[in-house]
């Protein structure tokens, strides 16, 4: 106990304040994450901090002090210590882990690579002209392994070439030429390692989602849930309107088929009875013209006229279509004729 007290007394005050500050930031935000800042210039970090000010707080501290702060907070928070490696910063926000990931990805920008650095991916120089006039630059490009020549008064890359494969060391000559060609192989920004949210730890792989696909999946799931609820007659605020409309249509159909005399179906019953009546009367009149009276004969005549008018409608449309086609053919013929005259007279 004495040894622990003695050790605590020798911790500098600024370290205690730093640990307290980290703990307060974690406790005052819903979410915090660890990001790698290795290779990022101080000026770039300052710019990122300004860009994030409306969404998140970025704090750079010593790994040892961050570790102490996490350990003192307890619960599952100390599990974040395994993501402390090399140069690390903390980021605090009240947004969701997914929003934080998206915002941090937007901080990444292409950056030149230095000589002696490892290529993160294949570095490719594309075929095509450059902005350089003929001069010493031609030999410099060639000595760096870039196939260059003179074309139309400009230095040009003769063919597309992989000048450095992923994992290989980039030479100083090549690094210089890549920068001159404005080829920036590095993507520099805050590299999210993990996010802590209410006891759960999310790694980048879980947060990198395709938003359009995600939205499509949710929409499809919502539609399937709606259909299931309607087909199982499960009432909710979203389905009650459809369920009532479906129930009304089914009850009306039942009333008509069962011939239930109700104010809600009387119009449909009368219309159905009228159709049945004219059908029977028509068959009777076909067998014996005197089987129907004058009034019923007028009804049958009106029905026959209406049916004939409906049957003629498609014929009229067909005639109009044929006339339009003939007019188009005439127009084309005139155009062809004019074109022919044009060719004759140059």
From Swiss-Prot:
It comes from the Archaea. One of its GO terms (molecular function) is large ribosomal subunit rRNA binding. GO terms for cellular component: cytosolic large ribosomal subunit. Coiled coil: none annotated. InterPro entries: Ribosomal_protein_uL10, Ribosomal_uL10, Ribosomal_uL10-like_insert, Ribosomal_uL10-like_insert_sf, Ribosomal_uL10-like_sf, Ribosomal_uL10_arc. Residues 307-346 are annotated as: Disordered. Keywords: Ribonucleoprotein, Ribosomal protein, RNA-binding, rRNA-binding. Transmembrane segments: none annotated. CDD domains: Ribosomal_P0_L10e. Residues 321-337 have a biased composition (Acidic residues). GO terms for biological process: cytoplasmic translation; ribosomal large subunit assembly. The keyword Ribosomal protein applies. Part of the 50S ribosomal subunit. Forms part of the ribosomal stalk which helps the ribosome interact with GTP-bound translation factors. Forms both a pentameric L10(L12)2(L12)2 and heptameric L10(L12)2(L12)2(L12)2 complex, where L10 forms an elongated spine to which the L12 dimers bind in a sequential fashion. The proportion of heptameric complexes increases during cell growth. Forms part of the ribosomal stalk, playing a central role in the interaction of the ribosome with GTP-bound translation factors. Belongs to the universal ribosomal protein uL10 family. This is Large ribosomal subunit protein uL10. It comes from Methanosarcina barkeri (strain Fusaro / DSM 804).
């Amino acid at each position: 106990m004495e040894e622990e007290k003695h050790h605590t007394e020798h911790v500098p005050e600024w370290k205690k304040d730093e640990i307290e500050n980290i703990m307060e930031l974690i406790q005052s935000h819903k979410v915090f994450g660890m990001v790698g800042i290795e290779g990022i210039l101080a000026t770039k970090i300052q710019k990122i901090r300004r860009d994030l000010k409306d969404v998140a707080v970025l704090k750079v501290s010593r790994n040892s002090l961050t570790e102490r702060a996490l350990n003192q907070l307890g619960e599952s928070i100390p599990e974040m210590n395994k993501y402390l490696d090399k140069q690390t910063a903390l980021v605090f926000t009240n947004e969701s882990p997914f929003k934080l990931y998206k915002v941090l990805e937007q901080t990444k920008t292409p950056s030149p690579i230095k000589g002696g650095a490892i290529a993160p991916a294949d570095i490719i120089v594309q075929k095509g002209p450059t902005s350089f006039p003929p001069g010493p630059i031609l030999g410099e490009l060639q000595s760096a392994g870039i196939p260059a020549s003179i074309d139309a008064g400009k230095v040009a890359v003769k063919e597309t070439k992989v000048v450095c494969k992923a994992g290989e060391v980039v030479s100083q000559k090549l690094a210089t030429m890549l920068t001159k060609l404005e080829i920036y192989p590095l993507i520099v920004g805050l590299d999210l390692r993990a996010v802590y949210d209410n006891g759960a730890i999310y790694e980048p792989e879980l947060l990198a989602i395709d938003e359009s696909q995600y939205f499509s999946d949710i929409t499809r799931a919502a539609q399937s849930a709606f259909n299931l609820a309607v087909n199982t007659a499960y009432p909710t605020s979203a389905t009650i309107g459809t369920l009532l409309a479906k129930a009304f249509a089914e009850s009306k159909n039942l009333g008509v088929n069962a011939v239930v005399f109700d104010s809600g179906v009387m119009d449909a019953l009368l219309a159905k009875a009228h159709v049945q009546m004219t059908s029977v009367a028509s068959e009777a009149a076909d067998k014996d013209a005197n089987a129907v009276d004058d009034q019923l004969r007028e009804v049958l005549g009106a029905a026959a006229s209406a049916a004939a008018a409906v049957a003629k409608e498609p014929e009229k449309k067909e005639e109009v279509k044929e006339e339009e086609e003939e007019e188009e053919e005439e127009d084309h013929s005139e155009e062809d004729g004019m074109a022919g005259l044009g060719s004759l007279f140059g």
